[in-house]
Amino acid sequence: MEFLFEYGLFFAKVATLLVAFVVVVSVVVGASQKNKYGEGRGHLEITPLNQQFEDLKDTMLIATTDESLQKAEEKKLTKAKKKLLSEQKKTAKNVSESDVTKRSKVYVLNFDGNISASAVGHLREEITAVLTQATPNDEVLLKLESAGGMVHSYGLASSQLDRLRKKNVPLTVCVDKVAASGGYMMACVADKILAAPFAIIGSIGVVAQMPNFNKVLKKNDVEFELLTAGEHKRTLTMFGENTEKGREKFIEELEETHQLFKEYVSTRRPQIDIDKIATGEIWYGSR
């Protein structure tokens, strides 16, 4: 009898472990299937700003009305909205689809950039969505904030804005705080840049920095080996002994990147003296 009890207890433990294993595997497989078939990619949130500002206007009107008259004002606004909605429905019946399409629209996007421009994926999807409807009569307004970062990441972000340019959709970039280096690479694509007086703009330059621990390793009798195939596979390293030849090659690559940056800006801003301003320095929006 005791044997049967112990056997049953052992069987219950094994069954519990098997169930737990199946649950874990199901979760992992489910997650991989979502990634494989593009589920869980997020969604676009589209907010009609006209209605938002109308609601704000009404709220302020009621808030600044004498308390004894607020209810009457609310009823008045509600009645006016119903009347306007009714008129719009009547008008809509007589308006052709082409007339609706001709109405100019402003699409407002946001880009808050970090060093790797990780928001570029969202920006790509947003611009794809806008381009399904936008025409040269419309406009895209991008609220941009970025101090720059990796060259290839911001090159990709800038190329997304170039898609609007190629479709002749006007682009305005608004800078409240900073659009420098890679951020300015994005901003220069725009037809117009609107910057706050003390917003930081520019920094058309390239920078690279790294520590070198080779002397520390030698001092502590630690050997470090770096094996490469290809003369310039590694130029400067953090742990190896850097050479003047490697340093010269690294600077050459920086200069080449800087030249590409200058060409990109001057193509989109032909009116500026690129050699004069592409010194890496920044300037303020009011300047």
Predicted regions and their residues:
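Small-residue-centered hinge/linker elements
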Residues: M1-V169, A190-S266
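Generic detector of short, well-ordered, non-transmembrane alpha-helical segments enriched
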Residues: A20, Y107, G183, Y284-G285
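Gly/Ser-rich catalytic serine loop of serine hydrolases
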Residues: S146-S153, T172-M185, G280
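Residue-level detector of family-conserved "landmark" positions at structurally sensitive sites
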Residues: C174, L227, D275-K276
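Active-site-proximal glycine-rich helix-loop-beta segment
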Residues: G183-K192, P197, G285-R287
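Secondary-structure end/capping motifs
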Residues: K262-G285
